[in-house]
Every structure is written in structure tokens, then in C-alpha cells.
Amino acid sequence: MTNEEFIKQHRNENPLSLALKKVPEGVDMQWCLRQIEGYNIAKKKLPEWSEKENIWFPPKLSMEQCSSEATAKYKQAITERLGNKVLIDLTGGFGIDFSYMAKNMETAYYVEQQEVLCNIASHNFPLMGLQNTKISNTTCEEFWKQYTADDTTAKTNRDKCLIYLDPARRNDRGEKVFSISDCTPDVTLLQDSLLEHSAYIMLKLSPMLDIVQARRILKGIAEIHVVSVKGECKELVFVMSKKADEPHYYCVNLETDEESFTSPLSATTEQADIADPVEIAEGAIIFEPNASIMKAGLQNAFAKWKNLRKLHPMSNLFLGNKPIENIPARQFVVEQTSDFQKANLKSFMQDIRQANLTIRNFPSTVDDLKKRLKIKDGGDIYLFATTLSDDTHVLIRCKKI
């Protein structure tokens, strides 16, 4: 039996169970188990790749760290809009981002220091229909040194070149790091040369990164993309250019029907209108901006965009008169409100034993308030504990739209 036959026969089985079975003659069991494990991850994360026959998958860590198909396609859309024809991916990895961004390029350079990943890329890229790819098994710093030393190539490509980096976010001890200068490579040391020899740089960073800090460190920021998938913030993508003007934010929530929200950097200083407490009545709509908008700090700009009022200057809950289709926010219809006077609260809570509790600008933790209210998680009732513009603490009962 060949490795390929074994994988095809067993790829939907549990690799841990397979590891306990007798190894058929001619089968490299360790390699096959890695392929089966990778395939099972790819079915959800990379469906197009999982459907291709004979794709090779890397070790589990590389599978976990690679972009999802959804976020890779989003970056592909950015490159198509920018119109570049030469791609240089200085941190190739498994090659998911590279494979999508390279599709419409005249030339695409894949740079990776791990030989095993370069071998996998050499095997996989033709299967994914990629042409005109150049694979370099070296460090990004060494490749860049050699590339810029070739003055003819560097000058020819400069105005049509996009450089992509996804710096490793683990240190030598395998611990996660989040600041740009702690990642490998350290883009802060390379950015001047990268900007000089390219039309654009695209930089993928951790969703945990402080965007304000990144704006201070990085040069030539043209675009900041805050990328969520199904409500969870997954990536920050910075587009840099020596010709950059005022940066623009792009807040997206992939695999949903929500609108994208685009705004200039200056909008982060906008102030939203404040709701009168009497407006928070039965039938009013509460809006909670999605993770991308919250991460970008564009809550107030979002409110201005949709003519919403803020419940309190320090709150990130907003009020409207009616539901809004495809808005990048969760929406809830107000059913009832209560202050925290003992008698009022007792009456308000008398039929509630289970609810989804959210704390916003309120002097308590979720766990402490759940104990006080004697409720369990779950169900179809949503409770918001918050503070109104007159500094009254309230509990708002809602139904999700």
C-alpha cells in the first residue's frame, strides 16, 4: 500500500486511533498521520485546499498559524484593488496567503527559511494552478539583501511590487509575543528599505496588537484593515506606501451579511450624540458594534454613520428607533428596563432564571452580577447591565433580532 492510498482510505478517521494500529507495509505512518491531521483541519479552515487531491500538509503548528481561506481571499481582494503585478511574500509559511494573492501576479516570490515548508510549497503550488512562482529557501533578510543588490530587478519591479509579511509571533522559547518589534522578522528594522523598493507593503499582525501603538511605529500607513470572521477579530492588516496620505480604516466581518465599514483615521475622534434616558423604552433598538469596529475604536463614527445615539458617553451601546438591515452590529429590541432598587429589580427578575448577560460601563463583573441576580447562562433572553446618560444604573431586558 502506498502513502497516498492509505491517506485516501483513512483521512476521515481519528489520527490518534490510527496511530495505535499496525503499520501496513510500504506506509510512512508518521507522515500519513500528519497528512490526515492536516486534512481534518483544512476541511473547516481551508475547504478549497482540502478538496484538491494529493495536497501536502505541514506540521500542526503551521496549520494552526496559517490564515483561513476566508481571510486569505480578503487579502487577495486587497491586492487586486491595488493592482500590483509582482508579489514578494517574505514569510511564506504554508503558503495560503501567497497562493491566493499570487493568482493574478506576473511574478510571485515565495520566501521561507524552513526547507520542509519550501518542499511542500513546491509540491502544492502547481496543484493550486499557480504559475510564475519563484521559491527561495532562505531568511527574509538574506533574500531581501540579495534582491535589492540586483539593481535592475529591484528598479524594474519597484512601482508594481507588493511585499507581504506575516511575522512570526512566537519568541525563541515558543512564547507568544504581540509587539511588532518582538516578532520575527522585526519589520521596524526593514520598513525603510521595503518602502523604498515597493509600491505597497502588506503586513499581517496579531488582533491583540495595540493599533495606536502600531501607528506610531510603522511608517507610510495607507490602510488599516480590522478583519473579523463570524464576529471574532482574527487579523489586523496594515497596507503601507511611501505615497500614503491619511490612513483609512476598513472594518469587515467575513462570512456574515454585515456591511463593511470604511472610515478615515480622523473619525476616531468623533463624538456620538447621547440618548435621553426616556428613549430607552419598550420597542427601542439597542445596537452593539461588531468586533472590528470596536477594535478600531470607531464606535462613535459608526453611530454617526447610522444616526444612532449613545446610551452614555462611556458606553459602547447605541440606540435607534428601528432595526437596520445588514448593519455591522448585533441588534436587540428592548422589552423592559429596571433600575437597581430592590423592589423594582425583584419584580423585573421574577420570571428570569436563565439569560445572556452583558456588562457595559457598569460597576460589577458578569460573574458577580449573575450571582446577585441568581441566573444561569443561556436561553433567548438578553440582559444588558449598563449606565445611562443621567448616571442611572439599569438592567435592560432584550430579545435578539
Feature map (PLM): residue ranges:
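SAM-dependent transferase fold signal centered on methyltransferase-like domains
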Residues: 1-401
